[in-house]
A protein has these predicted regions:
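N-terminal signal-anchor module of multipass membrane proteins
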Residues: 1-57, 64, 318-319
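C-terminal ends of transmembrane helices
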Residues: 10, 58-70, 106-117, 194-203, ...
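Loop-to-transmembrane alpha-helix initiation sites
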Residues: 120, 124, 234-242, 264-266, ...
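Long hydrophobic alpha-helical segments that form multi-pass transmembrane helix bundles
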Residues: 118-193
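Structural signature of hydrophobic alpha-helical transmembrane segments
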Residues: 42-55, 92-101, 175-189, 231-243
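Membrane-interface helix-loop-helix junctions at boundaries between adjacent transmembrane segments
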Residues: 78, 83-150
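Cytosolic-side transmembrane-helix boundaries in multi-pass membrane proteins
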Residues: 1-22, 281-320
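Alpha-helical transmembrane segments in multi-pass membrane proteins
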Residues: 25-33, 48-60, 77-82, 86, ...
Length: 320
């Protein structure tokens, strides 16, 4: 389905499915994670997500109006950017964090590169990385609570991955259900997987990128994580942090992924290895956002190496 939005090497595929339809389906698929975030972190989480969505839509509308461009706020792409950005924020973040992030995502990453289909990075993830670098304290404060479900504590509000990196064990059921610390939309693997199954059933996304991403990450952890084939540690890494949200909803972004099937497999492997590299050998316990951003920048190279050879190209020239 990504062929609708992707400016890529030929061959180009025609489809009757509209961009508007695809965006609405992704929005629906993100609802379980959004609802779970509100249940675990309270109404403040919903406020941050709504602020993020409103800022993204408003920024896109204002920019396109001022630049005398056709309004695209109704296609749903800005809403998805706002949703993903909001779900990648800690519930304790101040109100101005999603506002700054939303403006950066739409104005800098998306519109200044030409709008939908032209941006070279996932706008929501680029904004999250920008916020992490610029407002580290606000973006790494995971002490929020106040939801309908009591959160399982680790150490002073640390995320499960931080606890794992410190040598602690974390509760796998809490990681699966989501009643633990983390960003608003990443804690519940169950809610994310419900949305992922929805997208797969309706063929909104392809299995190749998320499955090769998660699979290659698992292999990397087994080989280099220092715990061998320890199933408990592997599940902590798979269910903790932003891997599930990143693999199913951000690595599959239509604009910033390869269009060829071989390219998608290569892309997934690269993301899995980069995430493992950042998590295991990096200073931070997480690495999904940076891995996907680096992967986005490699898309032209991946496509150049994996694009099918045109019929008749590369044949042997016979002398007359």
């Amino acid at each position: 389905m990504g062929e609708l939005l992707h400016v890529s090497s030929s061959p180009h595929i025609r489809s009757k499915v509209t961009t508007d339809y695809l965006m609405k389906m992704v929005i629906v698929a993100l609802m379980p994670a959004t609802v779970a975030g509100v249940c675990f972190f309270g109404w403040k989480a919903l406020l941050l997500v709504c602020l993020s969505v409103a800022t993204c839509v408003a920024t896109e509308g204002i920019y396109e109006t001022l630049m005398h461009k056709p309004l695209t706020i109704w296609d749903g792409s800005a809403v998805i950017t706002g949703l993903l950005l909001g779900l990648n924020l800690p519930a304790s973040a101040p109100w101005w964090i999603p506002v700054i992030g939303g403006v950066f995502a739409i104005l800098i990453v998306k519109q200044l590169f030409g709008g939908l289909g032209q941006n070279i990075m996932n706008p929501a993830l680029a904004a999250r990385c920008f916020l992490l670098l610029s407002f580290t304290g606000q973006m790494t404060n995971f002490t929020a609570g106040g939801g309908l479900v009591k959160l399982v504590d680790t150490v002073s509000g640390a995320t499960p991955l931080a606890a794992v990196k410190a040598g602690e064990k974390v509760d796998l059921l809490s990681l699966f259900l989501g009643n633990t610390q983390g960003t608003i939309g990443e804690t519940s693997a169950l809610a994310i997987l419900i949305g992922a199954v929805f997208l797969l059933i309706f063929k909104v996304i392809d299995w190749r990128i998320p499955c090769t991403y998660i699979g290659s990450f698992a292999i990397f952890v087994i080989l280099f994580g220092g715990h061998g084939a320890d199933g408990y540690y592997l599940l902590e890494q798979l269910l903790g942090g932003g891997l599930m949200l990143g693999a199913w909803f951000m690595a599959t972004d239509y604009v910033t992924t390869p269009i060829t099937k071989r390219g998608q497999l290569v892309y997934g492997v690269i993301l899995g290895c980069l995430t493992g590299l950042f998590r295991i050998f990096g200073a931070s316990a997480e690495g999904v956002s940076y891995a996907i951003i680096f992967g986005n920048l490699l898309i032209p190279v991946i496509e150049r190496l994996t694009v099918p050879t045109a019929f008749g190209k590369g044949g042997v020239k016979h002398e007359k």
